């Protein structure tokens, strides 16, 4: 089937530039929360039993979910948003909408409240790093 096409009619068909501006995507500063969540996991993986971004719960530009098992073998589902991190469930991939837990600005603060073993592992890692820097400075 052939159709006649007037090039003048196509000028506004795309509208991508205008649409992008209207949706706030021009020069986008939006964070991809999945990438943020991956960075969170990589930062503290050494101090927990297991930690990974949920593949079951849907991540979006404004929210991601992280599953973590502490060294005490307690499991949590964490929500990561612009507001911070908070516990939303006490099992992997579980979100309890009725759970009202505080937001933490950092994963360090959150894990510090949940896991004494995390606190110890983090402190030990920090001490080892400081000792290594001291040795490097003496060389």
Swiss-Prot record:
Function: A-kinase anchoring protein for GSK3B and PKA that regulates or facilitates their kinase activity towards their targets. The ternary complex enhances Wnt-induced signaling by facilitating the GSK3B- and PKA-induced phosphorylation of beta-catenin leading to beta-catenin degradation and stabilization respectively. Upon cAMP activation, the ternary complex contributes to neuroprotection against oxidative stress-induced apoptosis by facilitating the PKA-induced phosphorylation of DML1 and PKA-induced inactivation of GSK3B.
GO CC term (a single one): nucleus
Region (Interaction with GSK3B and acts as a GSK3B inhibitor): 115-139
Domain of life (superkingdom): Eukaryota
Name of this chain's protein: GSK3B-interacting protein
InterPro entries: GSKIP (IPR037395), GSKIP_dom (IPR007967), GSKIP_dom_sf (IPR023231)
Post-translation changes: Phosphorylated by GSK3B.
Biological processes, Gene Ontology terms: intrinsic apoptotic signaling pathway in response to oxidative stress; negative regulation of protein kinase activity; positive regulation of canonical Wnt signaling pathway; regulation of Wnt signaling pathway
Marked site (Required for GSK3B interaction) residue numbers: 130
Complex formation: Forms a complex composed of PRKAR2A or PRKAR2B, GSK3B and GSKIP through GSKIP interaction; facilitates PKA-induced phosphorylation of GSK3B leading to GSK3B inactivation; recruits DNM1L through GSK3B for PKA-mediated phosphorylation of DNM1L; promotes beta-catenin degradation through GSK3B-induced phosphorylation of beta-catenin; stabilizes beta-catenin and enhances Wnt-induced signaling through PKA-induced phosphorylation of beta-catenin. Interacts with GSK3B; induces GSK3B-mediated phosphorylation of GSKIP and inhibits GSK3B kinase activity.
Region (Required for PRKAR2A interaction): 41-45
Compartments where found: Cytoplasm; Nucleus
Example GO molecular function: protein kinase inhibitor activity
SUPFAM superfamilies the record matches: Hypothetical protein c14orf129, hspc210 (SSF103107)
Alphabetic keyword roster: Cytoplasm, Nucleus
Protein family per UniProt: Belongs to the GSKIP family.
């Amino acid at each position: 089937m052939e159709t006649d096409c007037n090039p003048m009619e196509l000028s506004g068909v795309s509208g991508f530039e205008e649409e992008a501006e209207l949706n706030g995507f021009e020069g986008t500063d939006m964070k991809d929360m999945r990438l943020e969540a991956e960075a969170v996991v990589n930062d503290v993986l050494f101090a927990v039993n297991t930690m990974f971004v949920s593949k079951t719960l849907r991540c979006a530009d404004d929210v991601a979910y992280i599953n973590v098992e502490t060294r005490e073998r307690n499991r949590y589902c964490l929500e990561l948003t612009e507001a911070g991190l908070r516990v939303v469930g006490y099992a992997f991939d579980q979100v309890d909408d009725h759970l009202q837990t505080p937001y933490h600005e950092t994963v360090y603060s959150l894990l510090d409240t949940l896991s004494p073993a995390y606190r110890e592992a983090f402190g030990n890692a920090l001490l080892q790093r400081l000792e290594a820097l001291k040795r490097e400075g003496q060389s």
